[in-house]
Amino acid sequence: MIFHLVPLDDWLRDPDRPYAPASLAEDGFVHCSPDEQTTLAVANAFYRDTVGPLMALLIDEQALDTGVVWEPADPAPPPGVPEATRFPHVYGRINRSAVAGMMEVRRDADGRAVALGPWS
């Protein structure tokens, strides 16, 4: 299982189409994380100012219609993530049938991501 962060509104925008975030057009792949702790570090580094619910998609990489390549962070991983960590990059749109679940990023009073919890 790999994780992908997405604002809830973005995920719900086109429910009948494969998911294609802006990073697919900009970077050529969809950024994902290998585990919950890394996902929280990414949320704190890049999504701290996101307004509204921030979700973590739980993606079954075996069910994807496209390939996943495990690559190092470029230029560096977010704070708290070991330098040697490899990140799963999905080189194509995410078919929604590969999304096995969705969790909400829980934040503290300062907006820091502290846990993943059930979406309510």
Identify the residue ranges that each predicted region occupies.
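Conserved, structured core segments of small domains
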Residues: 1-120
